[in-house]
Amino acid sequence: MPHDRKNSSRRAWAALCAAVLAVSGALVGVAAPASAVPATIPLTITNDSGRGPIYLYVLGERDGVAGWADAGGTFHPWPGGVGPVPVPAPDASIAGPGPGQSVTIRLPKLSGRVYYSYGQKMTFQIVLDGRLVQPAVQNDSDPNRNILFNWTEYTLNDGGLWINSTQVDHWSAPYQVGVQRADGQVLSTGMLKPNGYEAFYTALESAGWGGLVQRAPDGSRLRALNPSHGIDVGKISSASIDSYVTEVWNSYRTRDMCVTPFSHEPGTQFRGRVDGDWFRFRNGSGQEVAAFKKPDASSVYGCHKDLQAPNDHVVGPIARTLCAALVRTTALTNPNQPDANSAGFYQDARTNVYAKLAHQQMANGKAYAFAFDDVGAHESLVHDGNPQAAYIKLDPFTGTATPIANGGSTEQPGTPGGLPAGTGALRIGSTLCLDVPWADPTDTNQVQLATCSGNAAQQWTRGTDGTVRALGKCLDVARSGTADGTAVWIYTCNGTGAQKWTYDSATKALRNPQSGKCLDAQGGAPLRDGQKVQLWTCNQTEAQRWTL
């Protein structure tokens, strides 16, 4: 947690900065009691890709020691006694599921990756007394260059399981990840829209970024490199992002950027202004606390080098936020960062097209398309502090995927039905409820999350007609919209489809049948007081789990 600071003289200064959302945690969390999480949990891998054979690898670090885990979850350190010349690593592969099949292994407490390859085993090497040489397929000489593979990142420790689907290094074979909670429900992420895998490549090539695409000797697509790698090997031009960065630097010579990196500390803010080639940030006392040289394209796409983010509570959070604003090309349009509204992301013609398309093709809009995509909680990550099981589902390359559901099956849990009649709070998370701001029944007042209080603004009557009412008004999808991100507000009851809702007791989703989408906390986890509510593609995440 950031160090406490005396805020009495800083509050007036901080009020000049608009309130914005914060960075979320990535793959590190606050530890719960050690007894909460066992030494291993089951990991079920389901192969819906139609391809095989599949080879699995569980690789990572424990207590600073690198190694691999077998199917039973036993950790094996890599051999020592290795010098600076890489040597082949022991075969750590685990036989994966055949097409249409599943296998379950044990996932141990590690911080690392689960790799999976299609058709042939991968090649790993070790160096310098047991350090793993990870695949680096941006180099044509890498032994894994012509192998189709992908991986998920995970951390399992006493604080729970963090697992994500990642595109930080490349876009390749589609997959989902999930975690089962103690109540039996499964949170999942990573599912693509129908035909989203090929749609990504088509759009990337049409935008002139086809140099990132790597093909197998037979001409089939293997992956698209993340521009953080592509820029370093000359696969894309730096001209566009260089132009954008120059304009940003010039813009902030005469105005300030306000960075509010922590939602739980809205008073912790930093103001930055450009001086020469340096973007200099000050705290509330006017003291300079961080400075960043005008970054080159590699620094922006990789969020490193000139934008290096140390693991501290000042420079690192500022660097993360600044890099996210540059990658998403929101720095010019919004001086208050991080930007809370994803609708404004990637709108500049000079934007990171790779990241834009990765988010566009995700069913829930969330991706890990660059290193700090968790700024503002836009990353494809699920977490639970008491995980019962984990899931990876290898999805089809064409057509429509099905979401991970209870037990890791491909069937949706529960059957969406009617709306149970009754009156009471609509709870989400442990302490929050659906709320009419200021108990104001004016039409178009967008609903929000607020700490549960039991007042009239949080008492919702669920009718047999499918309506949800509070303060004499109906819960309504703004202007009968169907797009992700459409606001949900209260409005005079009118009997239209914009005011009809169903409830799935298994997934705890409140669904608007007219749009086919679910009631969603804007921006996802971490859930927080004041968070607006919207319509979004149903995804079984924490942001859509409502308790009647």
Swiss-Prot record:
Listed under GO biological process in this entry are: cell wall organization
Instruction: Please give the superkingdom of this protein's source.
Output: Bacteria
Q: What compartments host this protein?
A: Periplasm
- Which Enzyme Commission number(s) are on file for it? 3.2.1.39
Quick one: signal sequence residues? 1-36
GO molecular function terms attached to this record: carbohydrate binding; glucan endo-1,3-beta-D-glucosidase activity
Limits of the Ricin B-type lectin domain = 422-548
Q: Where along the chain is the active site annotated?
A: 153, 169
Q: Which reaction does it catalyse?
A: Hydrolysis of (1->3)-beta-D-glucosidic linkages in (1->3)-beta-D-glucans
Cited InterPro entries: Glyco_hydro_64 (IPR032477), Glyco_hydro_64_fam (IPR037398), Glyco_hydro_64_N_2 (IPR042517), Osmotin/thaumatin-like_sf (IPR037176), Ricin_B-like_lectins (IPR035992), Ricin_B_lectin (IPR000772), TAT_signal (IPR006311)
Q: What class of enzyme is it?
A: hydrolase
Descriptive protein name: Glucan endo-1,3-beta-glucosidase
What organism does the UniProt record list as the source?
Arthrobacter sp. (strain YCWD3)
Recall the taxonomic lineage recorded for the source organism: Bacteria, Bacillati, Actinomycetota, Actinomycetes, Micrococcales
